[in-house]
Amino acid sequence: MLNAILVPVGILGVFGLIFGIGLAIAAKVFEVYEDPRVPLVRAALPGANCGGCGLPGCDALAANIVGGSAAIDACPVGGASCAAAVAEIMGMEAGSAVKKVATVICQGTCETAPNRAEYYGEMDCREAMIASGGSKGCRYGCLGYGTCKAVCPFDAIVIGEDGLPKVDPEKCTSCGKCVEACPKSIMTLVPEAQEVIVKCHNFDKGKIARLSCTTACIACGACVKACRFDAITVENNCAKIDYDKCRQCYECVDKCPMNCISGDVEYGKSTAYIIEENCIACGLCAKNCPVNAITGEIKKPPYVIDHDMCIGCGICFDKCRKSAIEMRPNKTK
């Protein structure tokens, strides 16, 4: 009777031991190595899983950062602090990534670009596009039905009373969801500090563009002529700014006859001032000034800036090695 119990138990025990050894061997043979830095990087990421980095989520981004196929500042949500934390884990330098925010490159409000028809349907820009490109008179303009607002996971977008989306730069993480969702391609990411922006996406010729919107770019080229830094070109009948070259001197804003380039000339513009006690009269500022607004003699400080001629481009500020120049806003709100 006792043998009838012990024999099956012994057999089961032997089989259990054999299977256990087999599983242990299989675990070693088929083990998938995970770099110990992956969970550390994952913990440093914000965990939004928004896909703004171009990957399915934060887990995938962490693995790609450690694997070397993604930059340490690839997360648009975490910003500089997240990049610094990841850089510390990876033993690298974070660098200085420029924060970007979503911007609407359209000024076609209900008044400046009226509708050509009434739209009855789902309040979604993508669905409205099916009906002959939407109800807007300008076929390139914002429809204003709030698809960008609906897809924003951070509540950074609201639809204003004028029918155009308004982006809160404090909430925007530059994840790019709104850019992907906009059927008119008028949502774009620009550097947060960039105020001078062409707010038009109309590719029609000037006369036609003017008929559909009173603030449309007419490709007149006035901005191109005004820019001293070759930062503006006209492509497909619409002005385009190279933000890497733009000095935000507001000359293009002042010259645009259609007011389609954003920027507050009165309050946004700055003027350069010499800090006399720091000036060593090296002449770098005068040499690089594009309008010859700075005069003086080498080794005879201080140099003098003609504030009426200064366009506020800030080149002298960047070139000065002695912190002898500061940029002061012309007006403060």
From Swiss-Prot:
Annotated GO MF terms: 4 iron, 4 sulfur cluster binding; electron transfer activity; metal ion binding
Obligatory cofactor(s): [4Fe-4S] cluster
Catalysed conversion reaction: 2 reduced [2Fe-2S]-[ferredoxin] + Na(+)(in) + NAD(+) + H(+) = 2 oxidized [2Fe-2S]-[ferredoxin] + Na(+)(out) + NADH
Residues annotated to bind [4Fe-4S] cluster 7: C310, C313, C316, C320
EC number: 7.2.1.2
InterPro entries to which the protein is assigned, alphabetical: 4Fe-4S_dom (IPR007202), 4Fe4S_Fe-S-bd (IPR017896), 4Fe4S_Fe_S_CS (IPR017900), 4Fe4S_Ferredoxin_RnfB (IPR050395), Elect_transpt_cplx_RnfB/RsxB (IPR010207)
Segment forming the signal sequence: none
Sites where the protein binds [4Fe-4S] cluster 4: C217, C220, C223, C227
SUPFAM superfamilies registered for this protein in UniProt: 4Fe-4S ferredoxins
HAMAP family in UniProt: RsxB_RnfB
PANTHER family: ION-TRANSLOCATING OXIDOREDUCTASE COMPLEX SUBUNIT B
Assembly information from the UniProt record: The complex is composed of six subunits: RnfA, RnfB, RnfC, RnfD, RnfE and RnfG.
Protein name: Na(+)-translocating ferredoxin:NAD(+) oxidoreductase complex subunit B
Natural source organism: Acetobacterium woodii (strain ATCC 29683 / DSM 1030 / JCM 2381 / KCTC 1655 / WB1)
